[in-house]
């Protein structure tokens, strides 16, 4: 009964409502700007000697806080999306399905920006840090933000977008989209690759060359984010099917 009521009430909502996306983007960007300012201030003041008490205060405290918080957030988001899933997807109207497809696109936009911050901005920044500072720990200020904050954050958003599609959209609920699996799991696999990377730098290859074979895993898994184009093609195909020939003709 609740599912039917939810579906019926959703029909009255707007098909295109971008407020969620703008709120998500604003929150993400403001958060990372604050993080970047924090890095600039305390990276030099308290981030050069891992044995100093201030390093424990300003940096390791972040590490021990962010890891369990991100894990709980990812599991909680997936659990909530599954618990509140639409159990009668066959009753979803074309208009409501279109609204949900638009919402999925918004998830993907926020995911793309999160990947930019993690896999581009903070990753390139880490290269600058290595060229400037001789590190005495694997948990440098740059790594604490890059590996253990920005990567898990975009992974949590990937989990959200994947579970949203699987639990709300009939097309993606029919099976597993290979493109969606690639775009969601590929960049996430950079995180276990971090372990290989740090082990390699400790016992094998200490030079921080970005073109070194030890770093190829970052590129391989990072480029899997391009699977988003496959997901977009699937979304557009479904939009075309919902609109029909007459509706599609109006857009050309």
Q: What is each model feature region?
A:
Residues 1, 66-82, 148-161, 218-238:
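Hydrophobic cores of alpha-helical transmembrane segments in multi-pass inner/ER membrane proteins
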Residues 2-28, 94-109, 168-182, 236:
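Alpha-helical transmembrane segments and their helix-start/interface "positive-inside/aromatic belt" motifs
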Residues 26-44:
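Alpha-helical transmembrane segments of multi-pass membrane proteins
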Residues 41-61:
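Perimembrane loop-to-helix junctions flanking transmembrane segments
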Residues 54-66, 135-149, 210-219:
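Short aromatic-rich membrane-water interface segments that cap or initiate transmembrane helices
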Residues 55-75, 103-107:
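Interfacial helix-start motif at the membrane-water boundary
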Residues 177-252:
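C-terminal transmembrane-bundle signature of multipass membrane proteins
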């Amino acid at each position: 009964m609740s599912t039917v009521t939810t579906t019926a009430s959703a029909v009255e909502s707007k098909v295109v409502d971008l407020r969620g996306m703008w709120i998500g983007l604003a929150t993400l960007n403001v958060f990372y700007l604050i993080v970047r300012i924090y890095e600039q201030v305390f990276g030099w003041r308290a981030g050069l000697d891992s044995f100093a008490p201030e390093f424990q205060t300003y940096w390791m405290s972040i590490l021990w806080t962010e890891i369990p918080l991100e894990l709980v957030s990812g599991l909680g988001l997936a659990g909530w999306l599954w618990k509140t899933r639409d159990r009668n997807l066959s009753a979803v109207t074309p208009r409501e399905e279109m609204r949900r497809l638009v919402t999925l696109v918004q998830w993907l936009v926020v995911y793309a920006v999160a990947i930019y911050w993690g896999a581009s901005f903070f990753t390139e920044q880490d290269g600058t840090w290595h060229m400037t500072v001789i590190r005495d720990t694997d948990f440098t200020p740059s790594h604490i933000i890059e590996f253990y904050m920005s990567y898990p954050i975009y992974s949590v958003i990937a989990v959200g977008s994947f579970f949203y599609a699987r639990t709300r959209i009939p097309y993606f609920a029919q099976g597993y989209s290979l493109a969606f699996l690639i775009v969601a799991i590929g960049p996430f696999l950079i995180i276990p690759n971090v372990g290989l990377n740090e082990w390699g730098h400790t016992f094998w290859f200490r030079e921080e060359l970005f073109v070194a074979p030890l770093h190829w895993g970052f590129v391989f898994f990072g480029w899997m984010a391009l699977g988003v184009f496959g997901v977009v093609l699937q979304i557009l195909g479904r939009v075309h099917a919902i609109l029909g020939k007459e509706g599609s003709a109006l857009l050309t």
